[in-house]
């Protein structure tokens, strides 16, 4: 919706500071506004004002054209999206956008790793768990650039096990 994504702090923390609430409360408020419709009391916040406008515009366009188009060009027809309303459509498009963008990134990551000793162990909607071969640590910077090519900031964590991960500065490989 045109709001910048903070690079050094979580979006939820940025909004928590804006709301004057805790991080946990911020997540609840944010998800309620994004998935349940923006409540009047939050329309003064630029992000939510833009989200509300985007929901209305998307809903009008969906009803006018009879379909909605995903970022990669898939057309989802009204006939196939039963019992739809404006907020459900917005949620659906958030999920579709996230999935499509992640599939593009995942494809690039898999191509990047193709001729390497490093391997992907696990992928979730917001994380890649990689087993990086010790001779290929220098490739982390290129991998970070590849992933961030879609405009989303990336954090890198290293550890000997999933439960012992530490954030690192990719430039210096120092623990943050």
Which sequence ranges carry the predicted segments?
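Short, contiguous acidic/charged loop-to-helix segments that flank catalytic cores in large enzymes
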Residues: 88-98, 131-134
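Short amphipathic alpha-helix segments
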Residues: 94-114
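Catalytic palm active-site di-aspartate
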Residues: 30, 119-133
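Short secondary-structure junctions
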Residues: 111-118, 148-152
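Hydrophobic alpha-helix feature that most strongly marks membrane-spanning transmembrane helices
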Residues: 34-35, 107-114, 129, 133
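Helical catalytic core of nucleic-acid polymerases
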Residues: 1-86
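Non-catalytic terminal/accessory segments
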Residues: 11-12, 112, 119-121, 142-143
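Polymerase palm active-site segment centered on the conserved acidic dipeptide of motif C
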Residues: 134-176
